[in-house]
From Swiss-Prot:
This is 1-(5-phosphoribosyl)-5-[(5-phosphoribosylamino)methylideneamino] imidazole-4-carboxamide isomerase. One of its GO terms (cellular component) is cytoplasm. Belongs to the HisA/HisF family. Disulfide bonds: none annotated. The gene is hisA. The active site is at D8, D130.
Length: 246
């Protein structure tokens, strides 16, 4: 199971939000490209980038930084979310060397867009689903819907997405531990990989996820924990490799 560092971009800086609130941010670095290089040096084999301004603006705002990170690490698989709302945006990111784009709110509000993008960019589309108590949330978590997250994820699997990034929003950025049960339920219901996100705090959480990784959990995104040092990234990836026999 891959441990995937999150680099959340806001106003050109690397930050973390608590539960998706733009006003509740902690700035970790003024130089996100250096942050990316740091995680690569610590053994990261994939990066998760989020354009937070883009998510709220509906179009890329920190795209130049994303492209700079991709250019600095041409062999590193990178996934980007935040403001992915048109094929032109997707094409620009893929041209810049990004491997996957993550469609979030637009996937829920306009599911046909996902199917069309999977046909246009096969193998490069991931859907990010945020859920609270099994129900899908959208618009930077401002809106919890009545849509069942498993039902929607299955629909996107049929459309051809490469993976689902699943965030339990009651736990993200709060260092409360991963909602393993909810993540496993989703992974068991589908054949494409699920990437867990939200709530990873320490090595125990890595251990707990590794114990169920064979249910279809291919990776885990970690943010606040590795920036606030409740989890040492290199130790976490080493433990994951050891437990999965990598």
């Amino acid at each position: 199971m891959l441990l995937i560092p999150a680099i959340d971009l806001k106003d050109g800086k690397c930050v973390r939000l608590k539960q998706g609130r733009m006003e509740d941010d902690t700035v970790f670095s003024e130089d996100p490209v250096a942050v990316a290089s740091h995680w690569v040096e610590r053994g990261a084999r994939r990066l998760h980038l989020v354009d937070l301004n883009g998510a709220f603006a509906g179009e890329p705002v920190n795209g130049d930084i994303v492209k700079a990170i991709a250019k600095a690490h041409p062999d590193l698989p990178i996934q980007i979310g935040g403001g992915i709302r048109s094929p032109e945006i997707i094409q620009a990111y893929l041209d810049a060397g990004v491997q996957w784009v993550i469609i979030g709110t637009k996937a829920v509000n306009e599911p046909a867009f996902v199917k069309a993008m999977c046909e246009q960019f096969p193998g490069h589309i991931i859907v990010g689903l945020d859920a609270k108590d099994g129900k899908v949330a959208t618009d930077g978590w401002a809106n919890v819907t009545d849509v069942d997250v498993i039902d929607l994820a299955k629909q996107f699997e049929n459309d051809g997405v490469s993976a689902i990034v699943y965030t339990d929003i009651s736990r993200d950025g709060m260092l409360q531990g991963v909602n393993v049960d909810a993540t496993v339920r989703l992974a068991q219901s589908m054949s494409i990989p699920v990437i867990a996100s939200g709530g990873i705090t320490n090595l125990d959480d890595v251990r707990n996820l590794c114990a169920v990784a064979d249910q279809g959990i291919s990776g885990a995104i970690t943010g606040r924990a590795i920036y606030e040092n409740t989890l040492d990234f290199a130790d976490g990836q080493a433990l994951s490799d050891e437990l999965s026999g990598a």
